[in-house]
Amino acid sequence: MSHRILSPPAGLLSDEDVVDSPILESTAADLRSVVRKDLLSDCSVISASLEDKQALLEDTSEKVKVYLRIRPFLTSELDRQEDQGCVCIENTETLVLQAPKDSFALKSNERGVGQATHKFTFSQIFGPEVGQVAFFNLTMKEMVKDVLKGQNWLIYTYGVTNSGKTYTIQGTSKDAGILPQSLALIFNSLQGQLHPTPDLKPLLSNEVIWLDSKQIRQEEMKKLSLLIGGLQEEELSTSVKKRVHTESRIGASNSFDSGVAGLSSTSQFTSSSQLDETSQLWAQPDTVPVSVPADIRFSVWISFFEIYNELLYDLLEPPSHQHKRQTLRLCEDQNGNPYVKDLNWIHVRDVEEAWKLLKVGRKNQSFASTHMNQQSSRSHSIFSIRILHLQGEGDIVPKISELSLCDLAGSERCKHQKSGERLKEAGNINTSLHTLGRCIAALRQNQQNRSKQNLIPFRDSKLTRVFQGFFTGRGRSCMIVNVNPCASTYDETLHAAKFSALASQLVHAPPVHLGIPSLHSFIKKHSPQVGPGLEKEDKADSDLEDSPEDEADVSVYGKEELLQVVEAMKALLLKERQEKLQLEIQLREEICNEMVEQMQQREQWCSERLDNQKELMEELYEEKLKILKESLTTFYQEQIQERDEKIEELETLLQEAKQQPAAQQSGGLSLLRRSQRLAASASTQQFQEVKAELEQCKTELSSTTAELHKYQQVLKPPPPAKPFTIDVDKKLEEGQKNIRLLRTELQKLGQSLQSAERACCHSTGAGKLRQALTNCDDILIKQNQTLAELQNNMVLVKLDLQKKAACIAEQYHTVLKLQGQASAKKRLGANQENQQPNHQPPGKKPFLRNLLPRTPTCQSSTDSSPYARILRSRHSPLLKSPFGKKY
């Protein structure tokens, strides 16, 4: 027994035609299957017309169609007050969902999360009043026409459980769904053009296999056993038909999501007469049959399988004594297209056989009673119709088109099924539907962002693996969303609407064509001689493209021709590598040049910005330095002016002090002579005390001078402040000169005092001596006052120098420390205020003229002894202020 496996011809499914077919729209991709040598010259092709290719190109930008259908309320649902207006149709394309009370969406909205009203757009919305025939004419009719023309279509229903998905797909005996109506339209359109014998059978994803007479009889016996097995079960169930008639009615009235009234397990007892009536009814639809080419014959094959708990089961499996069903494997062909291994494909001749086989598959499908549906589909069922387009009477390579209708199991929250087998089923159903949503979201993102392509998780679920071909180039897809308008299922309905919103954004885009030359073109180009058989084939197919069969079967070519092809391919590969290397070098050079240019531009921008910032900072600091210079100049000019005034005043006082001793000395000599005998002992003691006081003043003066030199070294200003300190140093030198002059005068007074003492020893004038001592005391007090004023002046100069040094140092290091100058001035001002006498008001700042009185105060007459005056001068507070603190 020999099997002959064929792939579609070049004019239909070759690499060159992939460009004309969009993603989700094109027919099955070619397979490099082995073609028998004796069939190569007899193969004929059915090439797509130019108009069909143009139509395909026009549809490349079309979005995926998503239809919405709302089922009506049941009487029991109206009794439970499920109609709360949560599902509203705004127009034929817009649906508004309003969250009812006690729904999770409304509670989230009250907490500030989410929205209470959602609006969705669909290709078309069908209300509860739309019947099955109208729904089919508006949705499925054009898709069936495309399938008869050679395209592949996938239609899948999505929605929560008990939303009417199975009713939309299969319907009832009186109101057929889209699947029976599609079968009726297909067979009505193919009347008189069906292939008489099933000698070609679909295989893998898009291949066919030739069957001999024995294999044809086996296929017929398999179909007959399925049909007879179904009829025997119907005859056995006739005896209990009356007993379950009431239960079937209840089940039909409470369920919209299972095969009701003739398709569910509760209504499997429809008689053969009813089947005949149903098939006759579907065989005569109101729609006009689709016109197909008259020179083409068609062969219709169907398959029916389910995905239950991530396991694949054939629903058209012949009856056997085994209680455990055999699981199927999901495999890939050599081109990566998925297919179900060992899946039964049954040849059908009319709609009645297809309906009976559908009924047999429904009996084998997994149903169960759930919280929301008494007869709920617990698996994803996929009913596929493959049509082989045959031309000619001999051996042919057919074109294959496929129509797949998938009844997805309803999504349901696990809170309704908390344990047992139903919980496991619900988990697997929700997982597969979630994976389908992820795949659709990834496809949408890849279409919107061409530069960054994400991996599409088709392999995470068996359902998405089956759908992969329709989503990636082998056909087109359509989604039918079924909505349950009950308020209790609003949250699930909202999730289904959001899921469909992703699918509605997918766009049919053409796949990438690599443009790789075929093996036949290599041989024609590089072979010097062509065989006679190939010459005939080239003449017959001169207007067609290279078929994949020529590439698949290399036995028709000679060894030398194949070696030449290998050498040509090596040369072509080397050329391509050189071109790609040159392109890579060029791209790298361009990228490097662009990067260098960008770096230069950035460097230039940074340098310009730094220059601008530098100029701004220089202007800012120059302005600040200018302001500071003006303020310092004004301040020190005022200080110098006030200091000059004080020095002039001190000089005036010094001149007065010099003149007074000279005037009083002449009169004091006579007094000294008269009183020297009376006050000899007292004057000697007072002189010693005055001498000791003078020595103490000298010691303090020397220590003050040393301390002044020390502070001058410490407070030596930086070079920028040198012009300001020169004037101050000059004034300080003048003050020191005045101090030296005062010392000289003090020495002269001491000498005069000694001479007066010697004179007192020889004179007896006590009154004159007392008067002379009084004058000396006055002179000493004035000198002490003058010395104290000079010392205070020196302290002020030190303080001013400290201010200047601190200010200039802060300016020299950073301009930001200028604010600290004000606080330093405040602290220094506070120290000066602490030196003020207690009787001065706080609002005035004492200056040099306020520190010491200009004229000596009058002494009290009660305490006028020389000893008391000396004690007062020693305990004067004016002498404590400059030396009592350490600056």
UniProtKB/Swiss-Prot annotation:
UniProt keyword Phosphoprotein, yes or no: yes
Record-listed ATP binding positions: G159, V160, T161, N162, S163, G164, K165, T166
List of residues that carry Phosphothreonine: T855
Coiled-coil zones: 559-804
Tissue: Ubiquitously expressed, with highest levels in spleen and testis.
Post-translational modifications reported in the UniProt record: Phosphorylated by PLK1 at Ser-527 during mitosis, creating a docking site for PLK1 and recruiting PLK1 at central spindle.
Family matches, as Gene3D superfamilies: Kinesin motor domain (3.40.850.10)
Residues with the Phosphoserine modification: S7, S14, S21, S527, S683, S823, S865, S876, S881
InterPro entries assigned: KIF11-like, Kinesin_motor_CS, Kinesin_motor_dom, Kinesin_motor_dom_sf, P-loop_NTPase
Bias-annotated ranges (Acidic residues): 543-553
Any single GO BP term: mitotic cytokinesis
The Kinesin motor domain, residue ranges: 63-506
GO CC terms in record: cleavage furrow; Golgi apparatus; intercellular bridge; microtubule; midbody; mitotic spindle; nucleoplasm; spindle
Membership in a protein family: Belongs to the TRAFAC class myosin-kinesin ATPase superfamily. Kinesin family.
Identification of the protein by name: Kinesin-like protein KIF20A
Organism taxonomic ancestry: Eukaryota, Metazoa, Chordata, Craniata, Vertebrata
Gene: Kif20a
